Swiss-Prot record:
The gene is rnpA. The keyword Cytoplasm does not apply. InterPro entries: Ribosomal_Su5_D2-typ_SF, Ribsml_uS5_D2-typ_fold_subgr, RNase_P, RNase_P_CS. It comes from Streptococcus agalactiae serotype V (strain ATCC BAA-611 / 2603 V/R). This is Ribonuclease P protein component. It is an enzyme of class 3 (hydrolase). GO terms for molecular function: 3'-tRNA processing endoribonuclease activity; ribonuclease P activity; tRNA binding. RNaseP catalyzes the removal of the 5'-leader sequence from pre-tRNA to produce the mature 5'-terminus. It can also cleave other RNA substrates such as 4.5S RNA. The protein component plays an auxiliary but essential role in vivo by binding to the 5'-leader sequence and broadening the substrate specificity of the ribozyme. It catalyses: Endonucleolytic cleavage of RNA, removing 5'-extranucleotides from tRNA precursor. Consists of a catalytic RNA component (M1 or rnpB) and a protein subunit. Keywords: Endonuclease, Hydrolase, Nuclease, RNA-binding, tRNA processing. GO terms for cellular component: ribonuclease P complex. One of its GO terms (biological process) is tRNA 5'-leader removal. It holds the Pfam family Ribonuclease_P.
Length: 109
């Protein structure tokens, strides 16, 4: 994923948290804010409680891959995806199913 697709600054995270809407299921919480831009941006938060760095980075890679596969539906939004406890036990298909489920609840896809 290109760096232009990532939310990095604390200011951007705080703006999404304060002005954006949020949706959750058992495995993910998604904060989203509609923006006028040509592509989506995502920030991913995985707690240290979910595992060591290898496990957390694997979860982040899977989340990025799912979001890139839904790229056309997610235009014009900034996201913060927070992984909840239990995500570390999911394989890719289950993680994808849960993440798409929460995106559908939000009405984004």
């Amino acid at each position: 994923m290109k760096k232009t697709y990532r939310v990095k600054s604390d200011k951007d995270f705080q703006m999404i948290f304060s002005r954006g809407k949020n949706v959750a299921n058992r495995k993910f919480v998604i904060y989203y804010l509609e923006k006028e831009q040509k592509h989506f941006r995502v920030g991913i938060s995985v707690s240290k409680k979910l595992g060591n760095a290898v496990v957390r980075n694997a979860i982040k890679r899977k989340i990025r891959h799912v979001l890139l596969s839904q790229k056309t539906a997610l235009q014009d939004y900034d996201f913060v995806v927070i992984a909840r406890k239990g995500v570390e036990e999911l394989d890719y298909q289950a993680l994808e199913k849960n993440l798409i489920h929460v995106l559908k609840i939000a009405g984004l896809i």
